[in-house]
Design a protein with these regions (language model features):
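Short solvent-exposed loop/turn micro-motifs enriched in small/polar/acidic residues
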Residues: 59-62, 238-240, 336
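Short beta-strands and strand-loop turn motifs
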Residues: 101-102, 275-276, 346
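Acidic, glycine-rich segments within the central catalytic cores of soluble metabolic enzymes
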Residues: 151-295, 304, 323-333
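N-terminal helix-loop segment corresponding to the beta1-alpha1 unit
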Residues: 2-198, 291, 358, 364-387
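Conserved PLP cofactor-binding pocket of PLP-dependent enzymes
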Residues: 296-319
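Terminal low-complexity tails and localization/encapsulation signals of metabolic enzymes
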Residues: 2-17, 242, 246-249, 257, ...
Length: 387
């Protein structure tokens, strides 16, 4: 009975409507999270479709990026440069709680869809502008991608320093310069929604990729500002963490994370009385399988884990017990399996309600909700204002 009740409870953002003009990773990741939490997200694409549909590899003619980031959304197409398309966008905005965009600076203003324009039809709108460098400052008009923010924030240099301070910068897996700022955009939208609940006021949210990635590097930056020393210089002064990092086992790799206080536990797990160098630990792991190393160390309270491939991740029994892989049916791609929303709530349940939309899939129902007749909708299609 409890499980049935839990599933039937309304989701956190069920009454929130988001008009989503964003594209690629940055904005769509933020709105995906909001949609997972129950918000109605109306994704607005150009009549030819947003560029992220076209990235390889494709499944059912649509990229893996779009399948993942645009699930749980309703999809409409609009030619925003046409006055009738702009009119529809303003009508949708007037019935929305949040507008989000990540166009180049000034693009929405030129279309007549900037914050001040939307405020005229929805005074308490929350308007989230996502960009590389923010709405002001010397770099505000520069183009940006995730890699640019990660480079300028020190992220790539810090990662390279972990390998070799004298070597090249290292680009980590995945686009954290998009995904991390996307999470900050979620925080910003949720905070603004709460502020509006208290005060009745909407506001303009300015989310900069560079600002967010600097915040993500907050600890090493704080250390540098207080000491004048870079993180690798601090590490060179310490010896207690020499037993932390990736180690090769006989059939793969493990990551062992110790602190100076764990050395005795580490020796106990290894079954040795002396541990004089990193080479001793490397030799020990090399003679054992990944499972043997991990089992021996976690038995004595030393954090250790296999360094998994994606195949091993999705087959991991704990991952599946936690419900982290979910499925949804797509009309062209078939079954789409992807990671679930990661947060578990005791009273609500984020849901995989629908696959990413086909191009213009919800044009008719969204326009009908606005009061457009079937004849008017067909006229918009013939005029190429919608698909």
């Amino acid at each position: 009975m409890y499980v049935q009740e839990r599933v039937s409870l309304m989701t956190i953002l069920k009454k929130i409507r988001i008009l989503d003009f964003s594209h690629v990773y940055y904005g769509p990741y933020a709105t995906m999270i909001m949609a997972d939490l129950g918000a109605e997200v109306i994704k607005v694409e150009p009549v030819w479709g947003e560029v992220a549909r076209e990235y390889d590899p494709k499944f059912g003619g649509v990229s893996q990026v779009f399948h993942y980031l645009d699930r749980n959304k309703r999809g409409v197409t609009l030619n925003l440069k046409d006055p009738k398309g702009k009119k529809i966008a303003l009508e949708l905005a007037s019935k929305s709680d949040v507008v989000i965009e990540n166009f180049s600076r000034g693009a929405m203003d030129r279309l007549g869809l900037g914050y001040e324009d939307i405020k005229k039809v929805k005074p308490d709108i929350i308007y989230a502008s996502l960009s590389g460098f923010g709405l002001d400052g010397p770099y505000a008009k520069r183009p940006s991608f995730a890699s640019i923010a990660s480079s300028m924030s020190g992220w790539y240099r810090l990662t390279g320093d972990l390998v070799d301070p004298e070597g090249p910068p290292v680009m980590p897996a995945e686009w954290h310069g998009d995904l991390d700022p996307g999470l900050y955009a979620v925080i910003g939208m949720m905070g603004a929604l709460l502020h509006r609940e208290w005060t009745g006021e909407g506001q303009h949210i300015d989310v900069s990729q560079l600002d967010c990635m600097i915040a993500q590097n907050g600890i090493p930056i704080t250390g540098y500002l207080m000491s004048g020393m870079l993180p690798y210089e601090h590490r060179q002064k310490r010896t207690g963490l020499r037993f932390m990092g990736p180690f090769e086992a006989s059939n793969g790799w493990v990551f062992i994370h110790t602190s100076p206080r764990m050395t005795e536990r580490l020796m106990k797990g290894m079954g040795v009385e002396k541990l004089e160098s990193r080479a001793n630990l490397e030799n020990w792991t090399a003679e054992r399988t990944v499972k043997e190393v991990v089992d021996a160390l976690i038995a004595v309270g030393v954090p250790a884990a296999p360094i998994n491939s994606l195949k091993e991740v999705v087959e991991d029994p704990h991952v599946n017990h936690r419900g982290m892989i979910v499925s949804v049916e797509h009309p062209d791609a078939g079954t789409v399996r992807s990671p679930n929303h990661p947060i578990k709530y005791s009273r609500v349940k984020p849901e995989m309600r629908s696959a990413a939309p086909l191009l213009g899939q919800h044009n008719e129902e969204v326009l009908t909700d606005l009061g457009y007749s079937a004849e008017e909708i067909e006229g918009l299609r013939e005029a190429k204002i919608i698909t």
